[in-house]
Regions:
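Positively charged, low-complexity terminal tracts
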Residues: 1-88
Length: 88
């Protein structure tokens, strides 16, 4: 593996896991590396997780660099469209 940096950030949200059950997400783990499933040489990988519940309590996403940048732009656009008082 050739992970360049692993960035862990606290999160407060929910994720829908396998079987359709929802769980509280407390951590985001972001890193650029070889994917497990995506058909690309390298991907930006994001794990939405709750470490205290074990390794199964996570949703993993593998995105191409272009898709990751598009997602960043979409998140920024969505947040910017809401009133500042709502987004802090």
């Amino acid at each position: 593996m050739c992970t360049y940096a692993t960035v862990i950030t606290p999160l407060d949200g929910s994720a829908k896991g396998p079987g359709g059950s929802w769980f509280h997400v407390t951590n985001g783990v972001v890193y650029f590396d070889h994917p497990v499933h995506a058909m690309a040489e390298h991907t930006l990988n994001i794990d939405f997780a709750v470490p205290s519940a074990g390794p199964a309590a996570r949703v993993a996403v593998e995105l191409t660099a272009a898709s990751a940048r598009d997602l960043i732009a979409a998140i920024t656009q969505a947040l910017d469209s809401a009133p500042a008082a709502m987004t802090g």
